[in-house]
Amino acid sequence: MKFLILAGLLSTATALPIPLEQYAESSSEQRFIFYPPQVPPFFPQVLFPLPPQPPLVLTPNDLIALLIAILNQLGILFP
């Protein structure tokens, strides 16, 4: 079983990609290959930093509700 898994992984790793140009419908599609633009954004992200978020406070009631919800999902508290 381990040999089959190893053989499958090796065959996947050594498989050659199929060139898409062979399956194009016309020669004009082969000439127009579009790539995403490599232009930086107009507005730098440094000018608009996100405001800092305050740390969330977990109250005792929230902690109890969280624990009960987890136990209910596991089916331990109320099966």
From Swiss-Prot:
Top-rank taxon of the source lineage equals Eukaryota
Which UniProt keyword terms apply here? Secreted, Signal
Q: Where in the cell is it found?
A: Secreted
Q: Which GO terms describe its cellular component?
A: extracellular region
Signal sequence coordinates: 1-15
Q: Its function?
A: Tooth-associated epithelia protein that may participate in structuring the basal lamina at cell-tooth interface.
Q: What is this protein called?
A: Secretory calcium-binding phosphoprotein proline-glutamine rich 1
